[in-house]
Amino acid sequence: MRLFLLSFTFLMSISCSDDQPECIEDQITIFQETQADCLGATVKKYRFQGMTLYGFSDGQCISDGGTSLFDEECNNFCFVGGIAALTECNGVNFFENAEELETIWVAN
């Protein structure tokens, strides 16, 4: 039981690491506040076409949610997933060409 509580506490504490741009940290904070109760909501860091992108994936609270991808200057780069099951980002299939670097945050 103690190990479970420690693991749960650790997972709940996953948040912005210090190496994220300030504008991304601000967006993560807002996303956490609005998506905290939405199972499946995540923030992930990707390498895509030589760039670092941050993916904000809606959880189950948004029935047709997808992943909004932002660059390091917080520009909305593209949107994938959603009800239309979009895969193309900047001319190529995002899911086939992106490398997931880390999970920054997961809703409980």
Residue map of PLM features:
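A short, surface-exposed beta-strand/turn
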Residues: 63-79
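Bacterial signal peptide processing site
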Residues: 17-19
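Short acidic, Pro/Gly- and aromatic-enriched capping/linker segments at domain boundaries
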Residues: 27-47, 57-66
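C-terminal partner/receptor-binding element of secreted or periplasmic proteins
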Residues: 81-108
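C-terminal motif of bacterial Sec signal peptides marking the signal peptidase cleavage site
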Residues: 12-15
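Short linear motifs in exposed loops
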Residues: 56-57, 80-81
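Positively charged n-region of N-terminal signal peptides that target proteins for export
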Residues: 1-4
